[in-house]
């Protein structure tokens, strides 16, 4: 059946897109945050897993969706892909994730433990933050509505699967990308905005 837009939480007209050519993520004012929704044990089919990367600008507070990697894959590949993203960030931007969130509900704690082991073995020491998602998913994702509506979160037109999931939530067949974006946004918002201090006031 066709989805009625009025039943959905996010209006596509709210999506603000950034131009990759105009944003320099190498700038040190950007901090990188990641989140994985592995979808282990959620359904019989273990649908899509989602790895979201946000770049948060320390001064403006805006959050840019750098990467929205949503696909079907086994746990070993999820872990490998996360570590590759960390390596890519270090190689291309000179620094890795400030924080990386992983859901630890049900079977998903297993993936977090294996990710930590693999990360240490690779010498990457990913800064993993456990996120025990216990609240109602739809209500949790609904809290992201003002951030989308006010353009605090900036999207990339390349991320078609994420945008489609956003547009259809909560009526769509898949929501792993939306769930991971909400988790990533929550971790990024916990990191307070950067303030320029007057050294004179500190007696420096």
Task: Please name every model-derived segment.
Residues 50, 57-172:
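Mg2+-dependent endonuclease catalytic cores in nucleic-acid-processing enzymes, primarily RNase H-like
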Residues 4-6, 20, 184-204:
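Acidic two-metal-ion nuclease catalytic site recognized across multiple nuclease folds
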Residues 25-56, 180:
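Gly/Thr-rich phosphate-binding beta-strand-loop-beta motif of the actin/hexokinase/Hsp70
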Residues 21-27, 41-45, 84-93:
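Short, conserved, surface-exposed binding loops centered on an aromatic residue
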Residues 165-188:
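Charged alpha-helix within mobile-element recombinases
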Residues 1-3, 8-14, 156-160, 177-182, ...:
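Short coil/turn segments at secondary-structure boundaries
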Residues 4, 45, 88-95, 154, ...:
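Intrinsically disordered or highly flexible coil/loop and linker segments, enriched in small
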Residues 1-39:
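ATPase catalytic-site recognition across NTP-hydrolyzing enzymes
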């Amino acid at each position: 059946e066709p989805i009625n837009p009025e039943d959905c939480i996010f209006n596509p007209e709210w999506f603000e897109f950034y131009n990759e050519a105009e944003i320099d993520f190498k700038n040190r004012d950007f901090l990188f945050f990641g989140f994985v929704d592995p979808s282990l044990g959620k359904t019989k089919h273990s649908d899509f897993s989602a790895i979201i990367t946000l770049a948060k600008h320390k001064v403006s507070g805006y959050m840019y969706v750098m990467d929205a990697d949503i696909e079907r894959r086994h746990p070993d590949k999820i872990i490998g892909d996360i570590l590759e993203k960390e390596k890519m960030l270090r190689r291309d931007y000179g620094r890795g994730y400030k924080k990386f969130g992983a859901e630890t509900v049900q079977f998903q704690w297993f993936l977090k433990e294996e990710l930590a082991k693999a990360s240490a073995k690779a010498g990457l020491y990913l800064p993993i933050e456990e996120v025990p998602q216990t609240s109602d998913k739809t209500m949790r994702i609904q809290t992201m509505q003002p951030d989308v509506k006010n353009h605090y979160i900036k999207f990339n037109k390349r991320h078609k699967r994420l945008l489609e999931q956003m547009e259809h939530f909560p009526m769509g067949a898949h929501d792993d990308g939306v769930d991971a974006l909400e988790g990533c946004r929550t971790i990024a918002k916990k990191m307070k905005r950067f303030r320029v201090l007057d050294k004179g006031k500190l007696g420096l």
